[in-house]
UniProtKB/Swiss-Prot annotation:
Changing E389D: Loss of reductoisomerase activity. 1.5-fold decrease of the reductase activity with 3-hydroxypyruvate and the isomerase activity decreases 4-fold. The gene is ilvC. HAMAP family: IlvC. This is Ketol-acid reductoisomerase (NADP(+)). Induction: In the presence of acetohydroxybutyrate and acetolactate and by the activator IlvY. Its cofactor is Mg(2+). Inhibited by N-hydroxy-N-isopropyloxamate (IpOHA). It comes from Escherichia coli (strain K12). One of its GO terms (molecular function) is 2-dehydropantoate 2-reductase activity.
């Protein structure tokens, strides 16, 4: 099979990369009704599989789970989760032939085997759903022409998909129809009903394409979302210890610092995050971020180039075929790093202390978010998509580090994200070591003293922060999510 994106001509590639439309609330007036009375079978019962299924059932849909015979016979975790939540569970052969919509929510590396198994069992005119388009775009999976292929991609982990639904809200979601597989022209109706059933329409839905979702998702997770946090954690910890900081304190400052810093990012973008600093610290963080952007820009561009060309995917799929040798080696090496093995700090670190003593970390977040966003937009991805795949998801990933350091992050994210994370962080750490050697007192681990600043310089820096394109689109999207949340809670 050929990489689907690479079979398109340049005009088609640009059209699919640039497909992104923020959908109006009125477009979801029918809710999930298009799928009511139809049989929806989910393949896979992991975090997305279970939590999407719970939401869809609560929205009035007929949901069941198709699992491998061995998973049922051995009562594996997927079987236990589905049955304990009261779902009907059966084998592929028992459930797939009756399904109107089959949703494949297994890990990326299992998609080809799953799709090749279920396709012959699917009835004529059924629909196949994904929450990530890797199998279609990068693997180039060929789907029967009578089958409609759609995607609903919540921009949050499965657990948050469920929690936001229970609160009467939802999470921002991308939906798409594969242009090669919409024989009856009903793909968009199916995708909208599925998104509404998960609650996504209450938080904002982008009509996108399989191509735009995959290319932007891969770029975000490899660079700012995972790779930058891993590289930053390792570099900052080593620098703090080298400067004489207690390893336990250094570990806590970093482990919980990312989450604290990005909580401000979530509420008010880069502007609010930078406003948490004193004026002298803000000016220093801005200067550091500009240096970091200049150093890291070629690395971000290389990752985007390799994602667009398919080189990243072909390399990762070769590792799949080699029993994940590279992935497992990198995972083991990460677990042995000084940051991961440092003792726990029992003392308390106040919220503002994370900002005051984490100026470099804030600079890394700012540089990484802006670079990821800029690189995606320069490649033809629309700003709204780039925002969701950079700034929006960062607090969610930072939260995983706060739970159990880098180990937890790499367990929670997909194997695809983890593989890309290692590629980036293994290149980024040596790249930034000369920069780390030139840091000044107050950049990390110590607060920058209050002092006079030049009003003109502060004015210009504030304007540069606020006028960046990601701040403009972010303000619009965050405002929409807030408005939608008020509507959902009220009604």
């Amino acid at each position: 099979m050929a990489n689907y994106f690479n079979t398109l001509n340049l005009r088609q590639q640009l059209a699919q990369l640039g497909k992104c439309r923020f959908m109006g609330r009125d477009e979801f007036a029918d809710g999930a009704s298009y799928l009511q009375g139809k049989k929806v079978v989910i393949v896979g019962c992991g975090a997305q599989g279970l939590n999407q299924g719970l939401n869809m059932r609560d929205s009035g849909l007929d949901i069941s789970y198709a699992l491998r015979k061995e998973a049922i016979a051995e009562k594996r975790a997927s079987w236990r989760k589905a049955t304990e939540n009261g779902f009907k569970v059966g084998t592929y052969e028992e459930l797939i032939p009756q399904a109107d919509l089959v949703i494949n929510l297994t890990p990326d590396k299992q998609h080809s085997d799953v799709v090749r198994t279920v396709q012959p069992l699917m009835k004529d005119g059924a629909a196949l759903g994904y929450s990530h388009g890797f199998n279609i775009v990068e693997v180039g999976e060929q789907i029967r022409k009578d089958i409609t292929v759609v995607m609903v991609a919540p921009k949050c982990p499965g657990t948050e998909v469920r929690e936001e639904y229970k609160r009467g809200f939802g999470v921002p979601t991308l939906i798409a129809v594969h242009p090669e597989n919409d024989p009856k022209g009903e793909g968009m109706a199916i995708a909208k009903a599925w998104a509404a059933a998960t609650g996504g329409h209450r938080a904002g839905v982008l009509e996108s394409s399989f191509v735009a979702e995959v290319k932007s998702d891969l770029m975000g997770e490899q660079t700012i979302l995972c790779g930058m946090l891993q590289a930053g954690s390792l570099l900052c910890f080593d620098k703090l210890v080298e400067e004489g900081t207690d390893p336990a304190y250094a570990e806590k400052l970093i482990q919980f610092g990312w989450e604290t810093i990005t909580e401000a990012l979530k509420q008010g973008g880069i502007t609010l995050m930078m406003d948490r600093l004193s004026n002298p610290a803000k000016l220093r963080a801005y200067a550091l971020s500009e240096q970091l952007k200049e150093i890291m820009a070629p690395l971000f561009q290389k990752h985007m180039d390799d994602i667009i060309s398919g080189e990243f995917s072909s390399g990762m799929m070769a590792d799949w075929a080699n029993d994940d040798k590279k992935l497992l080696t990198w995972r083991e090496e990460t677990g042995k790093t000084a940051f991961e093995t440092a003792p726990q700090y029992e003392g308390k670190i106040g919220e503002q202390e994370y900002f005051d003593k984490g100026v470099l970390m804030i600079a890394m977040v700012k540089a990484g978010v802006e670079l990821a966003f800029e690189t995606m937009v320069d490649s033809g991805i629309i700003e709204e998509s780039a925002y969701y795949e950079s700034l929006h998801e960062l607090p969610l990933i930072a939260n995983t580090i706060a739970r159990k350091r880098l180990y937890e992050m790499n367990v929670v994210i997909s194997d695809t994200a983890e593989y890309g994370n290692y590629l980036f962080s293994y290149a980024c750490v040596p790249l930034l070591k000369p920069f780390m050697a030139e840091l000044q007192p107050g950049d990390l681990g110590k607060a920058i003293p209050e002092g006079a600043v030049d009003n003109g310089q502060l004015r210009d820096v504030n304007e540069a922060i606020r006028s960046h394109a990601i701040e403009q689109v972010g303000k619009k999207l965050r405002g929409y999510m807030t408005d939608m949340k008020r509507i959902a809670v009220a009604g």
